[in-house]
Curated annotation (Swiss-Prot):
The protein's name: Putative protein-disulfide oxidoreductase DsbI
Entry GO terms, CC: plasma membrane
Membrane spanning residue stretches: 23-43, 56-75, 79-99, 190-210
Keyword Secreted carried by entry: no
Gene expressing this chain: dsbI
One Pfam family cited in the UniProt record for this chain: DsbB
Endpoints of the signal sequence: none
Cell compartments where the protein resides: Cell inner membrane
InterPro entries from the UniProt entry: DiS_bond_form_DsbB/BdbC, DsbB, DsbB-like_sf
Family named by the database record: Belongs to the DsbB family. DsbI subfamily.
PANTHER family: DISULFIDE BOND FORMATION PROTEIN B, PROTEIN-DISULFIDE OXIDOREDUCTASE DSBI
UniProt KW keywords: Cell inner membrane, Cell membrane, Disulfide bond, Electron transport, Membrane, Oxidoreductase, Redox-active center, Transmembrane, Transmembrane helix, Transport
Membrane topology: Multi-pass membrane protein
Length: 215
């Protein structure tokens, strides 16, 4: 109750004060790294959904945001560390949305049988700054699937548990937020996650700047 009372009386000051605490930055770290871990450990390794080129780029951008949160959380009151956190956070969110838009267009082309729309999907990724992440951590960053096709492909020699079989059947038509309705594919869901993160970061950043001007 005290939080909402302070937010109502001085919204700019309250939002600005949040970023001086580690909690908000740790939330960003947990959220973004958590999504990557779920994508890798659950969907890739457990349900056998092979990641495509754009998928591993999305993982990269999420980890960039997580890194920004880690750096800012070291000392949130340190201006330099906070600026680095913001730069990495905004950068990760922006390129992440761009990757999502690209993946969504490929997904649409694949499922509409438009051969001219299926472009931008390679087995040899090119990460920003020339980082050879696919060589450093191939299980995490080497694309082994085709863009737009994210349905499970179970190896012939694998025996599935009943829970694995349930997941495989559940996502047999590909990853959707609501598979039975084919509602919101993975690219669209990730875009929303990035957009929400960007809006929150932007609001925090503006409130911080306004607070500095008050001082």
């Amino acid at each position: 109750m005290e939080f909402f009372k302070d937010l109502k009386s001085d919204p700019i000051g309250k939002v600005a004060s949040l970023q001086d605490e580690r909690a908000i930055w740790i939330i960003m770290v947990v959220a973004m790294s958590g999504l990557v871990i779920v994508a890798h450990s659950l969907f890739q390794n457990y349900v056998y959904m092979a990641p495509c080129e754009q998928c591993v780029y999305i993982r990269f951008s999420m980890l960039v945001m997580a890194l920004g949160g880690v750096i800012a959380a070291i000392n949130p009151k340190n201006i330099i560390l906070k600026i680095i956190g913001y730069v990495l956070g905004f950068y990760g969110a922006i390129i992440g949305m761009m990757y999502c838009i690209k993946l969504n267009s490929i997904h649409h082309a694949v499922h509409s049988e438009d051969p001219f729309g299926v472009q931008g999907c390679s087995a040899e990724p090119s990460f920003p700054f020339g980082l050879p992440l696919d060589m450093w951590a191939p299980d995490w960053f080497k694309p082994t699937g085709d863009c737009g096709y994210d349905n499970p492909i179970v190896p012939d020699d694998v025996s599935l548990s009943w829970l694995q079989q349930w997941f495989v059947d559940f996502y047999s038509e590909g990853w959707y937020l609501i598979p039975s309705l084919k509602f919101m594919n993975m690219a669209q869901a990730c875009f929303i996650a990035y957009a929400v993160a960007f809006i929150l970061l932007f609001a925090m950043f503006i409130c911080w700047i306004l607070k500095l001007k008050r001082a």
